Amino acid sequence: MYSHPSAKVDIVLVHGLNGDPQRTWTAKSPNGNGAFWPVDLLPKSLEAENAHANVLVYGYNADVSSKKHGTGPSSNYIHQHAQTLVTFLTTYRKSRKTTRNPIIWVAHSLGGILVKRALEHSDSVRVADHEDYRSIYVSTYGIIFLGTPHDGSELASWGSALQGMAGHVPRKFFDSEPVLIETLRKDNETLDNININFLNIYQRFKIHMVHENQKTDLKGTKSLIVDAKSAAPRLPGVTSYGVEADVSNY
């Protein structure tokens, strides 16, 4: 998305549930000309500090309610998305000869769960033919989690949020939930396993966990979609704090 010839770090942004690589990272403005901050704002801020970075925005099908990307709701499990992310980033870094650059992740909502699973997958690669995949784990320096439901969120909250932000939820949403929504349920086995495995590796990374302080307007009622307990669980060495924003406006 943005590359610098003297880049010493790769910053990777990963959107969340029902998001996309453009809209999620575009700041709203009254005149309608939003700033796409990975390109319009972040590079300038880095240059001001004499820091040079490549900024990558990763996109994947995180749809759960509509065919806005020309496809239906994602049927891939979080592990499949994680494998694809590791493969994509490995290929990109090899093509740019930046495989030794440290990686900083910025992950919103479900994107945080995806990043955790991707790092676990990368760490598990021990086959010589794919040793380059493990470089993603080895190169990761830091992670910024934005409103990531590490401990899950009630299904009703996610359904209401999507209804409020997207305007509708499929009639059968609560009867047959998309696999990505299922992953975010409290006490979901897949989510629990991701968290257990991440506890074994997280201390090698610099981690910031950010949670929302403002409730999301869900058509007349306001609610925290991801509470502080889930978005910022207490872990030794992890920095956690709230921001004055709701789940869709970090």
What positions do the PLM features span?
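Eukaryotic intrinsically disordered and solvent-exposed regulatory patches
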Residues: M1, L41-L42, L89-R93, N101, ...
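Short, surface-exposed "cap/lid" segments of acyl-processing enzymes
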Residues: M1-H52, S122
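Aromatic/acidic cage segments in peptide-binding pockets
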Residues: T26-A35, P73-Y77, W158-D175, A232-P236
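Serine-dependent carboxylesterase/thioesterase catalytic core
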Residues: H15, S65, H79-N195
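Conserved alpha/beta-hydrolase
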Residues: L46-S65
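Short, conserved loop/helix-junction motifs that constitute active-site signature segments
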Residues: P5-S6, E47-E49, R134-V138, L199-Q203
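C-terminal catalytic-base region of ester-bond hydrolases, centering on the histidine
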Residues: I11, G19, N54, D63, ...
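Short coil/turn segments at secondary-structure boundaries
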Residues: R23-S29, K68-G72, R117-H121, L155-A161, ...
